[in-house]
Amino acid sequence: MTPDPRLADSAFLKAARGEPVPHTPVWYMRQAGRSLPEYLAVREGIGMLESCMDPDLVVEITLQPVRRYGVDAAIFFSDIVLPLKAVGVDLDIKPGVGPVVAHPVRTLADVEAIPDLTPEHVPFITEAVRGLVGELGGTPLIGFAGAPFTVASYLVEGGPSKEHARTKAMMFGAPDVWDALLRKIAGISASYLEVQVAAGASAVQLFDSWAGALTPADYRAFVMPHSARVLERAGALGVPRIHFGVGTANLLGLMGEAGADVVGVDWRTPLAHAIALVGDRGVQGNLDPTLVFAPTEVMTARAAEIVEAGRAARGHIFNLGHGVIPSTDPDQLKRLTEFVQTYPR
């Protein structure tokens, strides 16, 4: 669809492309979520996956933080396992646990049984994105997908894991199955991003939540080529690509090399160090999410340090170093947003 002409002035998109910005743009991972009373109200009694498949609800939830905070970008409300559910994988998201897969992937036959994703699998995504773009006007919408390693971990472990033992056992011990699985997921994630961009998303973010469990050598050998496939297909869409993982200080350079325009940085890595690692790419981050619980002057002082450090990057998008914590005070996040957006350039 035809982009809103006001998007040409978006500070978020300018920063993502490495262009001069009127102010440091800001948005937050999980900005639409349990920290907002209006989110809890509309989600009451409705499961996560059911919520993600209801276009009207997705539009409302995605818009809530834009209305409340005035952030510089909206991120599409969904879940990284939704594309798997859409193609027929038997899974659910259990409160307090996370995604649970009924029949974990163990063999090549298990991989081959997973269908490729087509737009016909996710008509509700197209409808929701189109509705959002119409409502957002000059505020860009970020589409997103899960990166192959993180999605593979859920499929192999059968749910969330701290050790990723079965995942790594397959990676090291059954490389043919591993390669087939990550190729399959890369195709699904890339197709999911294509659907969102075709409907009007202005940027994409690839989430690799569990990549920090890998050494640089293992990431390069077993994971990076598959993430690169997703980012390459996203690059062909002509929108900025953000690549984010948690605990990835030793992988930031490689995550950029995989094909990102902007590399997300968690709170444990000094932003100046991250900028040196990613080279001629933008960065996103990276305030510790718990600093929103600190006195306002402490929070804003740390935010100022991050904004100042971000000046050395090709482009800087302010964010937390991970998702908004559910018990966060929305009023404090509003103060943070206004502070960053009005901080002198």
From Swiss-Prot:
Per the UniProt record, the source organism is Nocardioides sp. (strain ATCC BAA-499 / JS614)
A molecular function annotated in GO for this UniProt entry is: uroporphyrinogen decarboxylase activity
Kindly report, in one word, the top-level EC class recorded for this enzyme.
lyase
Q: Where in the cell is it found?
A: Cytoplasm
Gene3D superfamilies registered for this protein in UniProt:
3.20.20.210
Name recorded for this polypeptide: Uroporphyrinogen decarboxylase
Q: Per the record, what are the reactions this protein catalyses?
A: uroporphyrinogen III + 4 H(+) = coproporphyrinogen III + 4 CO2
Protein purpose: Catalyzes the decarboxylation of four acetate groups of uroporphyrinogen-III to yield coproporphyrinogen-III.
Top-level taxonomic group = Bacteria
Supply the alphabetized keyword list: Cytoplasm, Decarboxylase, Lyase, Porphyrin biosynthesis
Q: Give the gene symbol.
A: hemE
Pfam families from the entry?
URO-D (PF01208)
**Gene Ontology BP terms:** protoporphyrinogen IX biosynthetic process
Subunit structure and binding partners: Homodimer.
**PROSITE patterns, per this entry?**
UROD_1, UROD_2
This entry's Enzyme Commission designation comes to 4.1.1.37
